[in-house]
Amino acid sequence: MKKIFLPFAAVALLLSSCKDAAPKEELVINLQEKGAEVASSMYGIFFEEINHAGDGGLYAELVKNRSFEELEMPEGYYAEGDVLHPKKVCNHISGEVREGSFRWTTEPVPGWTLSTKDAAEMKLTKEQPKFSTAPNNLKVTIKNASTPVRLINEGYWGVNLVKDNSYQLRTIIRPASDYKGKVTALLLSEQGEVLASAPVDITAAGQWNDLSLAMQPTATSAKGKLALEFDVDYVSLFPEKTFHDRPNGLRKDVAEILEGLHPAFVRWPGGCVVEGISLENRFEWKKSLGDPAARSGEYSTWGYRCSYGFGYHEMLQFCEDIDAKAMFVCNVGLGCQYRMGDASPESKIAYYLDDCMDAIEYAIGDVTTEWGAKRAEQGHPEPFPLQYVEIGNENWGDEYDKRFDIFYTAIKAKYPELILISNHGLGGTGKIAKTDMIDPHWYVNPEFFFQNTTIFDNHPRGKYDVYVGEYACNANVGGGNMRAALSEAAFISGMERNGDLVKMTSYAPLLENRNDRSWAVNLIWLDTDQVLGRSSYYVQQMAAENRPTYNVKSNMTMSTPRIADYNEGRFGFGSWHTQVEFKDVKLTGADGAPIDLDLNKAVKKEGEWSLDNGLLKQTSLREPAKYIVDGFNGNQFTLEFKVRKEGGNEGFFLYFGLSEDSNKGFVYNVAGWNNGTTAVEGVIGGRTSGVAGDRVSHSLETDKWYDAKLVVTPQKSELFMDGKLILAHAPETTPLQFFSSGYDEATGEVIVKVVNSEAQSYPLRIKLDGVDSVEKTGKVISLSAASDMDENSFEEPMKISPKESEYKGFGKSFDYTFPPFSYTILRVKAK
């Protein structure tokens, strides 16, 4: 963390300006009531090749399309203009063949241009390749020898050249047997000025020459270029200064900002790239080993080619360099279920299992084993710090459960020390026999995190631990803002408090090149010469740097929410990947009088809906399907109907209290989460915003009619099925402050973390019970913003960043005023 120290006098002035605001609430912390320990593994990072996080990001390679493989398509795919169409495969859950389209480049040779098209031409060829694994090479034919010809690469939106720094060029060139010219390597500014020049000495005409040389630019250019004047198989340019000075290494500033998060582990390689759009373009770790020039790369799930430069060995080495454990995510023979969702034949499961076992052996196997020996050949005979294997990524359903059990049994038998993670969420573990950890994911709006800090409080213990592998506030926050960061800080407080259950967490996605945003909100932004953390980055850093040894109990974990009224809104039906029918729909008011309905009138339809003789039918597997009824707005009514599930994974949705545009309200998600749980979720921006209140175990049988009834009053709703109360819900305002407290045994400090998400300062009285003595002088670390809409930028990269100060007003009981829109950590010496 870049710490900014404030003199005590400045802090005293800040506090005295709020002296008239008396605390309305008291936080009582009892150090004798020890809570859950907080695992040293709690905070890690998750790397996936998305947003050019690797190529053009963490990976230090400066040349785009260095091996000329960018136009290679996955098997069975085809392109039409700038659209790539995947292979038609059968989704293993729905049985449907999904349509899909992904971006594709129309550049004839991506990343490369000729300075003059009249004097030369270029084309891709596979004639006599240097490496069969990366067979494409670029053939440049010079038609007019009197004109200098430059083959130019502009890198990933520019090549960052720094004056007097050294750059390592490697190129593999095969001149024609009758070529009499010379080849010169140039580093150019954005305007074309030559900043460095070096001859490339060809030693063998008609053969491949693998050549390396160093170059130093005479000036700095953030958007420089590399040029070769003159067949080319490979061109690579690396800064000499990489992270830990490793060849084929990582961009130093990007790796250092990741190291600044103090990650306990690194999850790799994904993410959806693990599965691929379909299995044809899944990430294949074995192809990421060895000479970078021989690596084929792969068209990524996220719409561009991944070079495999930041490969398996490089990831493991990075973990060792930053003292983090490694997590490998394997493919179980399933394509991405949010995309094509194909499954390998059962006969191929052994292939995918063997591939996973080989990956483990490469990381930690003895040098006498096949893959341990290959690791040693790469200069690392000692085992790498692999500790976790996640079996699949975001997979679900019976087919996944079957394959998970196969993998779990085989891996545990050979490597019992490894921690194995399933893709299941909080809704249940399906049909699997056993898992060490589950991995729920959340990409949500701020209200979800604010409203769900207690989501783990009553979750069953003893069967497995929890790894929250992907989470972020990324809805209704633009590219990210302070409100998103504060909601994440609040959610983190709940995860820390439940440290006996939640052992690991990682924000996602991690990195974004500003020139290619594939995902709305990301933790760290970069371009060719700059890297910066969003406000959320500093929340993650502060949480990791101030992790207590264990929690201590307090009288409250949030400020008191207030009971609210449901909106006088519309109601409707829906489903998620499920075919469902509704009939005998009846609506009555608070006085018991019937209310006329015309189900033909709908203000919103999503999915395949039909209405025939009072039977409302949804026949698609849309996620979600919606049918919002027009003609009624209210918050005091009884809705009765019959419902039947006809097929699919889940139950049904019952919307109510929806706004005029149907974008805000509530929904009963009945038998959701793989037909295992019923809960009420908020609706914000037309999307479910997460569970609001309790959840109960509940499922529906296929092909069975149920009598359903929803009773709504302004401050309460109840759902009945076949006359039995399933769930009740009361709307509440979103809490504005959140608290967590713990003790650091190494320093003898109480750690108090407070989120204030409102626009006013928040005065709080803090009382420390169960202590003999408290030192008056301690430390305050605070992250705050003038507005919750604020965010860091390339122009103001430290606009929202932690400020650390000394504070001399601590005691067994003390008042502290927390700034508006702030995340504050108090460290108080106590024993």
What is the role of each PLM region?
Residues 317, 406-423, 436-437, 441-547, ...:
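Catalytic-core region of carbohydrate-active enzymes that cleave or remodel glycosidic bonds
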Residues 492, 498, 506, 521-561, ...:
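Catalytic cores of secreted or luminal carbohydrate-active enzymes
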Residues 736-774, 780, 824:
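Carbohydrate-binding surface patches
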Residues 27-118, 245-270, 553-613:
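Extracellular carbohydrate-recognition regions
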Residues 45, 76-139, 274-312, 339-354, ...:
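Aromatic- and acidic-residue-enriched carbohydrate-binding clefts of CAZyme catalytic domains
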Residues 190-221, 673, 687-705, 787:
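Extracellular carbohydrate recognition and processing domains
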Residues 64-71, 138-140, 151-183, 209-216, ...:
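Extra-cytoplasmic beta-strand recognition segments
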Residues 561-733:
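Extracellular glycan-recognition regions
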